[in-house]
Amino acid sequence: MNQSIDDKVDSRIKEDLSPTRNLTGLHLKIVASIAIIWSLFQLWYASPFPFWFNIGMFKGLPARAIHLGFALTLAFLIYPTFKGKKISIFDIIISFVGAFCCLYIYFFYDQLVDRGGVLLNIPVSENFNLPVELILGSLGILILLEATRRAIGLPLVIIASCFLLFSYFGRYAPEIISHGGLSLNRLVGFQWLDQEAIFGIPIGV
């Protein structure tokens, strides 16, 4: 009897201290399935099979976008907003939105390359009909910051946010580090649609 109580107490303590959800049943199967599919995708992409069979070949940026899409989906299903909280409708919705923001790059990569980012150079102040890339890119950045907060913690989010703010408000910084500042279009376009920012070397590796 005492052993059973001790086990329950230990289980509750581990659940409270763990940053991840204690998934069971259908939720566990869904998360495990997504993780397995992600792993298979990574193995396929890194293998010579796409070149041998001439199928399933991915360019660099679309492949990285798919990778981040899987990561964001799992992040919101595994890491709760608050410790011990079960998967909510909000978690499911935000995971799908985050994945869509990434997969947009995969599905419309050729159009993005053909347009050369022309839409993203339209100043926001002159056009209230924001380009879809600007909307999805902004959402993607915010969702990525929230996923980072859940999985790693607030300090890294604060650091990343400071650099984003510095990029936008650079003209107001001390003279020694000041710059002209990026428009919202250019900032989002660079961060979300370029291989030198979010989809850079860390994801590529």
Regions found by a protein language model. Name each.
Residues 53-60, 118-205:
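Hydrophobic transmembrane alpha-helices of multi-pass solute/ion transporters
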